[in-house]
């Protein structure tokens, strides 16, 4: 009997030892796994703190994006993808040909509607930002005299404006409408700045903060701010008004980062008037709606004192107002603006790169990137 109890006790001790050993092994595995997880989290947090490694110094006069790409390779690689042909059922260029198809060949009524305007000569589907200067240089519209103001939004032109204005970009800008496109474009090439929209057009080279640089936009947004038109899409303007309008509204000082994610696009994706008759003009003095824009143009006079018009129809002689591409104006009146959604949220949505979050610099239609551009909200 004693032998039986002794054997049972030994067996129990063996089982207890096995359980204890198994528990120790499990605890060790869990401890190792938790340690690895915590180390990974720590490393990711440290990685997220280092958003860039500056290998070269860049300035506002470095218009070649390749130089910026040394410091910010992910953004540069994405920017280069704007050279790819993309198309949705609403527009774009998805073909393999050198130039997009002529819209005036596909829809001949456009040619007649634009008679007296250069769009009756050449009007094609759009391509990406990478081609914005090249396509402008090669368009058949150049067979007619064009103003230097056309380069305002098709080139990284700020260094040239500063050169022409003796260091004052606004003065340089105001001088270019009287110059021919051919002459101004030659100066751009001679200075080595013949680049499409580039990094310093939207980023401060020292801080990488978003900035707006285009003179016509700055003049236009100041006129909008000085008006009495409500601007729920731009709360910084409302705050500036409430503070007493002590100095001219400056989006680079007053605007939030969220607003700037729209304003950098609104430098060019807007309604405007561009000709050799007057400096490039943005019609926001009365507001951004179509009716308010019409009031602004109706109160605007041509240099000879006559009624403002974009062009006179060659067949009927009727003065025509032609809307350009008022995307910012349309956005400002829509549900996305009311919801605080910026242009970049949909056209340059955030993407994960390791532990860091970056804006996708492949600027394109949200319909080509629905999972990140749309489904963050529309689920």
What function would you assign to each model-found segment?
Residues 129-133, 154, 203, 269:
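Aromatic/pi-system hotspot detector in well-structured domains
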Residues 5-8, 16-27, 33-121, 163-200, ...:
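Primarily the internal scaffold of c-type cytochrome electron-transfer domains
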Residues 143-160, 166:
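A cross-kingdom signal targeting lumenal/periplasmic-facing segments of multi-pass membrane
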């Amino acid at each position: 009997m004693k032998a039986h109890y002794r054997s049972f006790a030994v067996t129990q001790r063996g089982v207890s030892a096995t359980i204890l050993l198994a528990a120790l092994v499990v605890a060790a595995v869990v401890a190792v796994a938790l340690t690895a997880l915590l180390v990974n989290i720590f490393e990711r947090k440290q990685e997220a703190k280092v958003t860039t490694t500056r290998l070269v110094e860049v300035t506002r006069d470095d218009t070649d994006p390749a130089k910026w790409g040394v410091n910010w390779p992910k953004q540069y690689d994405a920017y280069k993808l704007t050279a790819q042909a993309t198309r949705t059922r609403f527009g774009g260029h998805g073909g393999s040909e050198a130039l997009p198809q002529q819209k005036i060949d596909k829809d001949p009524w456009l040619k007649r509607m634009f008679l007296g305007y250069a769009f009756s000569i050449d009007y094609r589907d759009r391509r990406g930002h990478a081609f914005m200067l090249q396509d402008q240089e090669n368009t058949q519209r150049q067979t007619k005299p064009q103003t230097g103001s056309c380069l305002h939004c098709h080139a990284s032109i700020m260094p040239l404006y500063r050169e022409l204005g003796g260091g004052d970009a606004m003065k340089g800008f105001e001088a270019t409408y009287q110059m021919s496109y051919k002459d101004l474009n030659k100066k751009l090439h001679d200075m080595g700045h013949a680049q499409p929209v580039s990094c310093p057009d939207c980023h401060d080279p020292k801080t990488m903060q978003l900035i707006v640089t285009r003179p016509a936009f700055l003049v236009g947004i100041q006129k909008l701010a000085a008006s009495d038109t409500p601007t729920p899409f731009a709360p910084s303007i409302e705050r500036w008004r409430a503070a007493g309008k002590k100095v001219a509204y400056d989006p680079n000082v007053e605007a939030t980062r969220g607003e700037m994610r729209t304003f950098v696009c609104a430098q060019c994706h807007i309604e405007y008037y561009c000709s050799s008759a007057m400096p490039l003009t943005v019609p926001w003095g009365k507001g951004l709606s179509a009716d308010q824009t019409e009031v602004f143009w109706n109160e605007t006079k041509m240099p000879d004192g006559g009624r403002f018009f974009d062009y006179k129809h060659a067949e009927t002689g009727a003065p025509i107002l032609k809307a350009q591409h008022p995307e910012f104006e349309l956005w400002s009146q829509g549900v996305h603006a009311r919801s605080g959604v910026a242009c970049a949220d949909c056209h340059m949505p955030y993407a994960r790169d390791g532990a860091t979050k970056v804006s996708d610099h492949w600027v394109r239609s949200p319909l080509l990137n629905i999972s990140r551009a749309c489904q963050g909200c529309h689920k």
